Amino acid sequence: MKNQINRKFIYFICCVSAMGGLLFGYDWVVIGGAKPFYETFFGIEADPAMQGLAMSIAIAGCLVGAMVAGFFADLFGRKPLLLFSAIVFLLSAYMTGAVDTFVPFLIARLIGGVAIGVASGMSPMYIAEVSPPATR
């Protein structure tokens, strides 16, 4: 019975951790749906360069987050780093919706991208760490 409970718990942990990989797609779907509205709100509907920057700055953040994730995981641990990246992503999502000028919007998107990059890099590592060797 105990083995079954542990197995279910491991599956639960793996499913929750795998959601870190979903953040990238989630971010693109949400920002894509909001695109017509924030372009009008920030007055960038006639500026393709700014439109592209608003969409792609999160990818730059992902790159940074993925590059530093290993260093910080060694420093703080994978689980605390995953929790921290989730909190940072939530805060960046709030900031993205709460700001009223374009530059803070870009900063919030960049910070969210860093959190996505960290979570994307740490999720598979954490899943491998908590999984029993027989089921890896």
What are these regions (language model features)?
Residues 1-136:
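Transmembrane-helix signature of 12-pass secondary carriers
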